[in-house]
Curated annotation (Swiss-Prot):
Residues 1-183, 291-388, 403-669 are annotated as: Disordered. This is Ensconsin. Residues 425-439 have a biased composition (Pro residues). Interacts with TRPV4. Microtubule-stabilizing protein that may play an important role during reorganization of microtubules during polarization and differentiation of epithelial cells. Associates with microtubules in a dynamic manner. May play a role in the formation of intercellular contacts. Colocalization with TRPV4 results in the redistribution of TRPV4 toward the membrane and may link cytoskeletal microfilaments. Residues 89-152, 460-589 form a coiled coil. It is found in: Cytoplasm, Perinuclear region; Basolateral cell membrane; Cytoplasm, Cytoskeleton. Highly expressed in the epithelial cells of the kidney tubules and in the absorptive cells of the intestine, and widely distributed in the testis. Expression correlates with the differentiation of certain epithelial cell types: in the adult intestine, more abundantly expressed in the differentiating than in the proliferative cell compartment. The expression clearly correlates with the degree of cellular apicobasal polarity. Expressed in lung, kidney, brain and fat. Colocalized with TRPV4 in ependymal cells, in the choroid plexus, in bronchial and renal cortical tubular cells. Keywords: Acetylation, Cell membrane, Coiled coil, Cytoplasm, Cytoskeleton, Isopeptide bond, Membrane, Microtubule, Phosphoprotein, Ubl conjugation. The modification Phosphoserine is found at residues 161, 183, 200, 202, 209, 219, 235, 254, 282, 336, 366.
Amino acid sequence: MAEQGAGGDGHRGGDGATHSDPASDGYKVQEKRTAPSRPTSTVSGQTSNHSGNKPDPPPVLRVDDRQRLARERREEREKQLAARETVWLEREERARQHYERHLEARKKKLEDQRLKEERRRAAVEEKRRQRLEEDKERHEAVVRRTMERSQKPRQKSNRWSWGSPLHGSSSIHSGDPDRRSVSTMNLSKHVDPVISKRLSSSSATLLNSPDRARRLQLSPWESSVVSRLLTPTHSFLARSKSTAALSGDTASCSPIIMPFKAAHSRNPVDRPKLFVTPPEGSARRRTIHGLASHKREREREHVPFHVSPGARRTLSPSNLKARSPAPARLWLPSKSMPHLPGTPRPASSLPPGSVRAASAQAPSSSPGNIRPFKREVKVEPEKKDPLPAVKSRVPLVKVEEVTVEEGTPVKPPEPAAPASAPIATPAPAPATDPAPVPAPSSTVTVGVVPKTSAGTTDPEEATRLLAEKRRLAREQREKEERERKEKEELERQKIEELARRVAEERSRREEEARRLEEEQAREKEELALRLAEEERERWEREEVERVQKQKEEEARAREEAERARQEREKHFQKEEQERLERKKRLEEIMRRTRRTETADKKTTEQRNGDIAKGVLTGEPEVPALPCMASSGNGESAESPHGVALQQSEVTTESSPDLEKQPNENGMSIQNENFEEVINLPVGSKASRLDVTNENPEIPLKPILAFNDEGTLGPLPQVDGVQTQQTAEVI
C-alpha cells in the first residue's frame, strides 16, 4: 500500500507540478492534451507518512486556463491583425507618397515644357512682329515715294501746261518792252505808213481769223510770241516796196524768248541750251518748229542751246533789280539793230580801245565777210526733279541767224557801216523812268554778230504755225497726261498688289500661327487626357490589386479562423469523450468498491485489534473524498480521522486472500504493501476488484463540469455519495 500511495502521490505530484508551473503556452496546451489520458487514483486510504502531499487541483482551474489561453490567443491574433493592418497602412502611405511625388515630377516637367513652349512662341511672335513692322515700314516708304513721284509730275504738268500761268510771268511781262532790241523798237517807230498799213491788216486778219474762235484765249506769253511774230523783220522790209527808203543796214527783231524752264533735266549737264546757227548763204528767215512725235522731241531735249556772245544785252540797274529774284530764267536779248536811214545814229561814248577789248572775242576779218560763232550760256540749274518722266511741254525752237552776205544786191543810199564796228547801246534812263529807250552806258558793250530771225512775215503762216504748235502741244500734253495716268494706274495697281500680298502673307502667317497654337493646345489636351487616363487606370489597377490582396488576406484569415474553430471543436469533442469514458470507469470502480465493502463488513468487525476498537468508540470519520476535493489550494486536512479513513480504505481494497491470512495475536497486517495497485488506464481490463464490485449506486469519481455553465451534475452529489459510503462502512 505504501508503494501504491507513493505511486499515487507521484502521479498527483506530477499533476500538481504540471498545474503549478504555467510557464509556456505550448507546455500548457500539451498538458491539456495529456491530462485526460493520465490515470486518476481513487485510493481512499493512505498512510500517515504521505499525509503532507498536495492533492490534485480541481478541474475548474483547467477550464479557466483554457479560457485564459484562448483569450491570449485571441489577443495575439488581434495583435497580429493590427500589426498587419499597420503594415498595410504604411505600405499604402508609402505608395501614396510615391504617387504624389510622381505626380509632382510630372507636373513640374509639364510646367517646364509649357514655359519653354511659351518662350519659344513669344520669340517667334516677336520675330514675326518685327518682320511685319519692317514690311510695313518698307511698304509705307514705297507708298510715300510713289505718292511723291505721282504728285511732282502733276505739279510740273500744271506748271508747264499751255493754259496755266507761268511762275514769274509778272516779271516776264514787266520786262516785255526790254525783251525787244532797240533797233526793233526804233524800227516800229519809224516804219513806213505802207508797211504799217500792211501790218495792221495782217494783224487784223490774224486776230479776226475764224481759227481764233475755235482756239482758247491766248495767254500773255503766247500774246507776246504772236506780237513778236507779227513784228516786221529786216528781210521783209528789204523785200517790200519801200525797200529803197530803208538804209543798207539790216535790222533784226528780238529772238523768240523761251523760259529757261523749257530745258529741264535731273542733271544740269542734260539741260537743253538754245543755240543759234549761222545762215549758209541766204538772207531769209527760217524757224524750226517743235516736232510732232514724242520720240523726236526727247531726242531734241539733249540738243544744247547756243547764244552768240554778241547777242548778250546788258540790263539797266532797274532791270537788274527787277530780275534778280528769278535767277533761273534766262532772257536772251536781241542784237542791236542799226537805225533806219532817217534816224540819226547816236555817237558811241566808248573809247576805241574799250570797244576793241569788248569785241575781241568775236573774230572779225573784214566788214564784208562776217561769220557768226556760237557761245554757250551757263545758267543756274533748277532744282533737280526726282522724276524725269514729265517732259517739256514747250516745243524747242531753233532760231537761225540771218546775215547779209558779201555781195548781197542791196542798194542802200549810204554805204553800210562796217559790221565789225562796235555799237554802244544807250543806257536806260533812271530806274523811275519807265521809258523803254535806254541811255548810253560806258559799261555795256555788244558784240557784232549776225542778226537773228524771229518769225515769218506772213500772218496766215504765223497763224498756221501757231495753231500747229498749239495742236502739237495739246497732243503732247494729252499724250503725257495719258502716260501719267497710265503710270499712276500702274503704280496704284502695284501698290494695291503689294498691299494685297502683304495682307495675304500676314493673314497666312496669322492663320498658320493660330493653327499651330490650336495643334499645340490639342496636343496638350490629348497629353493631359492620356496622362489622366493612365493615372486613372493605374489607380484602378492598384485599387483592384489592393482589394484583391485584402480579399485574399480576409479569406486566409477566415480559413485560419475556421481551421482553429474546427480544431477547437475537435479538441472539445475529444475531451468530452474522454470525460465520459472516465466517468464510466469511475462508476464501475465505485460500483465494485461498494460491493467489496458490503461483502467484507462482517469479517472486519470480527477481527481483534485497533480496528474493532475504533469501531466501538463510534468516532465519526471524515470522508476521504471531501478531503481530496478540498479548496483549490491543493492542501488536504491532516487529522487522525483522515489517517483512520485511509487505513479503512486500504483494508477495503485488499484482495479476498487477506481473509485467509492468519491473524497473529489478534492484529491484522496493516503495514504490508499490496502487490496489486489499481491502475485503470483507457481501455485496460478490470481487475478482480472491479469484477467483484457490482453496486452501481456509488460513483467512483466525482462528476466535473467541463463547460463553463456546468451542465452536468454538481460536485455536492459526489460529497453526498462519499458521506453515505463512509456511513455504510462505519
